[in-house]
Amino acid sequence: MSQLTLTLLMIVAAYLAGSVSSAVLVCRMRGLPDPRSQGSGNPGATNVLRIGGASSAAMVLFFDMLKGALPTYLAYLMGIDAISLGLIAIAACLGHIYPIFFGFKGGKGVATAFGAMAPIGDDLAICLMASWVVLVLISRYSSLAAIITALLAPLYTWWLDDRFTIPVAMLSTLIIIRHKENIQRLLKGEESKVSRKKRPKAP
């Protein structure tokens, strides 16, 4: 099989893997409202945190990251070049953003993009996660944390393993474009802050 054929097959496989909406499936299994019609309307871990609590959000986060990590890492093991790895990672994110199995209404792709970047190295994964967590704790805006972390990701990659700077920059660009509406709401002071589902008070 030629390198081009293998790359195209992995792009299709990555898109299909990304199209499995973890948020919708976890909410269905746990009897929670559809995240596409509740909270922010975004089927991602942050919105599931709002409507279903931390454990449900953690499940969504894990599986969304896995959707990006598995196809990208498998392609890396197959010897696919760095630029093609970037295209495969983008395909996984596009599947998450526009899932064919869920009416093309998906999330922002942040966790899936992080999952695709994480196999580059533990040091990069730690830098990205630490940046996002610190920014969320400071600002309470998940979207702002994601945008700034996406901007930092190519710089971290260039510093730690410059072979993958271009693929990571491609992913970061996609994430920032996907947050266009969030950027507008942030500028207007209308963006929702991170909050957990409130437990009902005991009678």
From Swiss-Prot:
This protein's membrane topology, according to the annotation, is: Multi-pass membrane protein
Annotated GO biological process: phospholipid biosynthetic process
What's an example of a GO molecular-function annotation for this chain?
acyl-phosphate glycerol-3-phosphate acyltransferase activity
Catalytic activity, reaction form: an acyl phosphate + sn-glycerol 3-phosphate = a 1-acyl-sn-glycero-3-phosphate + phosphate
By its UniProt entry, which PANTHER family does this protein fall under?
GLYCEROL-3-PHOSPHATE ACYLTRANSFERASE-RELATED, INNER MEMBRANE PROTEIN YGIH
UniProt-listed SMART domains: G3P_acyltransf
Q: Give its E.C. classification number.
A: 2.3.1.275
Which compartments is it annotated to reside in? Cell inner membrane
Q: List where the protein spans the membrane.
A: 6-26, 82-102, 118-138, 141-161
| UniProt lineage | Bacteria, Pseudomonadati, Pseudomonadota, Gammaproteobacteria, Alteromonadales
The top EC class is transferase
Oligomer and partners:
Probably interacts with PlsX.
Q: What is its main location?
A: membrane
Pathway given for this chain reads: Lipid metabolism; phospholipid metabolism
What GO CC terms are in its UniProt record? plasma membrane
* The keyword Cell inner membrane belongs to this UniProt entry's keyword annotation: yes
Q: What is this protein called?
A: Glycerol-3-phosphate acyltransferase
Q: Which keywords annotate this record?
A: Cell inner membrane, Cell membrane, Lipid biosynthesis, Lipid metabolism, Membrane, Phospholipid biosynthesis, Phospholipid metabolism, Transferase, Transmembrane, Transmembrane helix
Summarize the protein's role: Catalyzes the transfer of an acyl group from acyl-phosphate (acyl-PO(4)) to glycerol-3-phosphate (G3P) to form lysophosphatidic acid (LPA). This enzyme utilizes acyl-phosphate as fatty acyl donor, but not acyl-CoA or acyl-ACP.
Keyword hit for Lipid biosynthesis: yes
Please name every pair of cysteines joined by a disulfide bond in this record: none
Highest taxon above the source species: Bacteria
* Entry similarity comment: Belongs to the PlsY family.
